[in-house]
């Protein structure tokens, strides 16, 4: 346990670092966005590149793969939509005045965040902006969306305010904001962090947002009332990435650890160590926690025991993103390569320290 393994396949077609990796809803394809200004589509069946998307005038910061289209955003201030069969650019969404950091496609809407201090909403089928969310005092980074159907139980006399759902944004100004998509108005400002908000995760049924910050904390918020519910304090460095799984929050940090917290109490129930640099990416899959780090390694931990099960070595620089499909781990790195790893045989039980039942859904 903990030993290194060789990659099943190394895909090195990009000529610059890979900034993001997105898995299609059916798990059959992967999309990578790169510093070389292109995005590439890959088959998960054989690891072959099946489409190249060219057109951005600067590096690709983020990407999202849907069933019928691929979406990319770039430092060239634009978002683009691509045909996954032909590689043709179907739409260019213009309006941001600086680097576009993130995109999120949901309910036939495209949301984007930018260094220009705004988030924007577009119809997926049109190139015209439908809403601008303005109010942050600095760069806007992470995005999350709560659809109207997720808010149904909370709707009351002001149903029209929530009719388009809620958008949650995090910013380097130290706040997160909750926006009414239908009107573009700020519904709540979530204040409490003393550093930039780098990541967020949304519990839509519970109307709760979890934010991670350079102030080394994770915070839980009621997105309807704006109330700060809990502060998770044990990290010793910036919180870089978050994932919410079965009412447990996993947080990856510059302190070289991942921590597992009970979402409803804020209790830290597990710390995953062994990283030699910051934890830059994480993904939970079938009882295993996969992590990517600035030390150029990916790791697999048993989530019940915290035991390190496997180390995946081969990348030359930081791993920026990871995905898992069936029995294969996909890692994308600033070294420009996408690597595929066999993860069969990881669920051998280690010494068990069960999480209290109240932390499970």
Residues covered by each model-derived region:
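Hydrophobic core register within WD40 beta-propeller blades
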Residues: 21, 60-63, 103, 140-143, ...
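Terminal intrinsically disordered, low-complexity extensions flanking WD-repeat/beta-propeller proteins
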Residues: 304-361
């Amino acid at each position: 346990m903990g030993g290194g393994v060789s990659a099943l396949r190394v895909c090195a077609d990009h000529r610059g670092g890979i900034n993001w990796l997105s898995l299609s809803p059916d798990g059959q394809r992967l999309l990578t966005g790169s510093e070389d200004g292109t995005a590439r589509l890959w088959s998960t069946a054989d690891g072959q590149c099946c489409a190249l998307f060219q057109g951005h005038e600067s590096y690709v910061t983020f990407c999202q793969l849907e069933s019928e289209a691929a979406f990319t955003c770039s430092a060239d201030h634009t978002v683009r939509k691509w045909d996954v069969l032909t590689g043709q650019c179907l739409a260019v969404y213009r309006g941001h005045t600086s680097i576009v950091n993130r995109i999120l496609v949901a309910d036939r809407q495209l949301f984007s965040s930018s260094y220009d201090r705004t988030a924007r909403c577009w119809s997926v089928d049109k190139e015209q902006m439908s809403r601008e969310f303005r109010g942050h005092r600095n760069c806007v980074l992470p995005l999350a969306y709560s659809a109207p159907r997720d808010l149904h139980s909370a709707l009351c006399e002001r149903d029209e305010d929530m009719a388009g759902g809620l958008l949650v944004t995090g910013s380097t100004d130290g706040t997160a904001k909750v926006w009414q998509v239908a009107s573009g108005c700020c519904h709540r400002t979530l204040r409490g962090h003393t550093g930039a908000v780098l990541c967020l995760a949304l519990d839509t049924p519970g109307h709760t947002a979890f934010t991670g910050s350079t102030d080394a904390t994770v915070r839980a918020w009621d997105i309807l009332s704006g109330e700060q519910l809990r502060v998770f304090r044990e990290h010793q460095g910036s919180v870089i990435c978050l994932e919410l799984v079965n009412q447990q929050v996993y947080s990856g940090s510059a302190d070289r650890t991942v921590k597992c917290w009970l979402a409803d109490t804020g209790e830290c129930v597990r710390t995953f160590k062994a990283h030699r640099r910051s934890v830059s990416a994480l993904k939970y899959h079938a009882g295993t926690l996969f992590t990517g780090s600035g030390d150029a390694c990916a790791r697999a931990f048993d989530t019940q025991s915290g035991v390190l099960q496997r180390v995946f070595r081969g990348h030359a620089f930081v791993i920026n993103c990871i995905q898992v499909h069936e029995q294969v781990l996909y890692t994308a790195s600033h070294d420009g390569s996408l690597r595929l790893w066999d993860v069969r045989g990881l669920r051998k039980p280690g010494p068990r320290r069960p999480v209290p039942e109240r932390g499970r859904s």
